[in-house]
């Protein structure tokens, strides 16, 4: 019974991510979510109680990976290695959580009305920590004197664009869906821009 419950919740959550990403919170309908999930509409309310709760769960499904992406900043490490790992993880999140990433981006653009105060505080605290780490590397002469805030913003923009603007990327590349080689090229390109552009010293 538990496995059926988890499977149904996962189906609904995935369908909701797609619906909210395509239509936004206001326009998305639970009936469409249920149809996309291949389940009766009452199941949506049975497992999630309301459309708003379901929307919050979609946000939660992307917030946790975003926080975990900063793990390299939370332990001792060389800046080049930390930045490489961070960028690769951010690219992977954009690939594996594309719809939820779009929902999160839309939520942020609208002032994050559905994001809990606790999650907002956690995200802000982690960003502040990452910025402090970058500033520390600058102070130690391990990289160029760039603005750490804008470096972090640039990494966010460069990596998240592969989820948030996938339609544009598909139009330019002529591919309906990027493959492993494309994502590897994306990660390597961003890494090179950051490491070389910010003159980050490589570990000896």
Regions inferred by a protein language model and the residue ranges of each:
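C-terminal peripheral helix-coil segments that are non-catalytic and often amphipathic
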Residues: 92, 96, 124, 128-140, ...
């Amino acid at each position: 019974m538990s496995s059926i419950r988890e499977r149904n919740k996962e189906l609904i959550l995935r369908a909701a991510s797609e619906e909210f990403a395509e239509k936004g919170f206001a326009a998305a309908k639970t009936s469409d979510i249920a149809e996309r999930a291949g389940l009766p509409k009452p199941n949506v309310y049975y497992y999630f109680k309301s459309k708003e709760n379901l929307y919050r769960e979609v946000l939660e499904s992307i917030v946790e990976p975003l926080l975990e992406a900063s793990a390299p900043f939370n332990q001792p490490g060389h800046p080049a290695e930390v930045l490489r790992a961070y960028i690769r993880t951010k690219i992977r999140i954009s690939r594996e959580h594309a719809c939820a990433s779009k929902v999160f981006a839309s939520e942020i653009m609208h002032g994050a009305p559905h994001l809990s105060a606790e999650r907002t505080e956690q995200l802000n605290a982690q960003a502040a920590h990452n910025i402090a780490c970058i500033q520390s590397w600058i102070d130690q002469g391990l990289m160029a004197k760039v603005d750490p805030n804008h470096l972090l913003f640039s990494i966010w923009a460069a990596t998240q664009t592969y989820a948030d603007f996938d339609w544009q990327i598909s139009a330019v590349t002529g591919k309906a869906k990027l493959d492993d080689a494309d994502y590897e090229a994306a990660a390597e390109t961003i890494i090179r821009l950051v490491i070389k552009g910010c003159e980050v010293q490589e570990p000896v």
